[in-house]
Amino acid sequence: MTTVSTTADAPAAASAAAPYLSVNNIEVIYDHVILVLKGVSLEVPEGAVVALLGANGAGKSTTLKSISNLLRAERGDVTKGTIEFRGKRVDRLTTNELVRMGVCQVMEGRHCFAHLTVEENLMTGAYTSRASRSEIRADLERVYHYFPRLRQRRASLAGYTSGGEQQMTAVGRALMARPSMILLDEPSMGLAPQIVEEIFEIVRDLNTKERVSFLLAEQNTTVALRFADYGYILENGRVVMDGKASELAQNEDVKEFYLGLSTAGRKSFRDSKHYRRRKRWLA
């Protein structure tokens, strides 16, 4: 298996501190039959941006839902392994309990309430908050500071806003819960490149200024590795490679199979021989 570093070395590479979030050898089964994750392990240090990369169907979204405990709504279950946040087991907590601990997920597809205004959507993120009204208004102003476009669209029905504005609304809604860890699923999906850059710049600002940690699942490997500190690559429900984002971006296998580049120049996925990749990585 080609690696940049081993998973066990990941905390040392990204941070000397103990991992903020630790996923340890988890297996996930849907409908008591379909094995989707096959021993996935990863770590997110406090204050880091970690990218979870891979093709569609590799297991990225399932990994995030395992952490946020949204699997049960889809008849899925973690049947092996543990998940720890701040040193405590969280794999059997409810989603509400995880939100109160500081873990929020922004799901793939944005999932805004189309019949509510942008501001009403944002306010739903404060539903579990024990903050006072003045504190909630301050949180709302903080969201508008990072997403000034949402201030302009605050009275518009979310269903009539653009895909980029809906993605911003979904992230802003998560911020209203005052998270210390955000699980961000496919933030670039269906968005124009300029909007993708804008959203990732905001993720960077939230990370550097607010110390919010991010675990983001993303198919856009090029953008994700530019903004992340560390990365894991999933293939068929397994972690096949991990390392510092800067090192992954220079790895020849990653260049060929995920960035569309090789020593011969840019290549398409159609031209790549995927069976060789699987044989090399999963042997």
What positions do the PLM features span?
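Conserved ABC ATPase signature
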Residues: 157-161, 165
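Helical segment within the ABC ATPase nucleotide-binding domain
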Residues: 197-211
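The feature captures the beta-strand-to-loop junction immediately N-terminal to the Walker
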Residues: 53-55
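ABC ATPase signature
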Residues: 116, 160-161, 174-175
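Conserved ABC transporter NBD signature motif
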Residues: 78-88, 135-140
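A short, proline-enriched helix->beta-strand linker immediately N-terminal to the Walker B motif
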Residues: 176-180
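ABC ATPase nucleotide-binding domains
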Residues: 260-283
